[in-house]
């Protein structure tokens, strides 16, 4: 089965609108627990990261793509920047604030990932 390549910029716009809608719906509830996104959103977000990772692996600086491939990834809404990194239990975890990350272009997303990896090195 042949999959159509993901247009990262377009998918980021769609995901950002979905995120805003989920946040608006949450704000209209009396829910006391913290805001979380749907499992579908998480799946789509990490699929976008997979597409971005393929771009990094195909790049001449493919080290960054292979690093992202090996690292754990998660969402963290309270980050003050689009990305962040921690090292725990022998593994690196790259965190993404989708509010900030999804507003970047694909090239800026690549730069943000490279920037985080360079912090580690």
Features from the language model and the residues they span:
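Basic/hydrophobic alpha-helical interface regions
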Residues: 1-113, 117-121
């Amino acid at each position: 089965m042949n999959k159509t390549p993901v247009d990262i910029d377009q998918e980021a716009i769609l995901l950002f609108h979905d995120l805003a809608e989920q946040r608006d719906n949450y704000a209209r509830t009396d829910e006391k627990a913290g805001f979380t996104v749907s499992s579908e959103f998480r799946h789509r977000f990490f699929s976008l990261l997979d597409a971005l990772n393929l771009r990094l692996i195909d790049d001449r600086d493919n080290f960054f793509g292979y690093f992202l491939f090996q690292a754990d990834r998660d969402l963290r809404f309270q980050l003050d920047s689009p990305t962040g990194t921690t090292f725990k239990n022998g593994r690196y975890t790259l965190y993404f604030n989708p509010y900030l990350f999804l507003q970047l272009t694909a090239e800026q997303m690549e730069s943000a990932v490279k920037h985080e990896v360079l912090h580690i090195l």
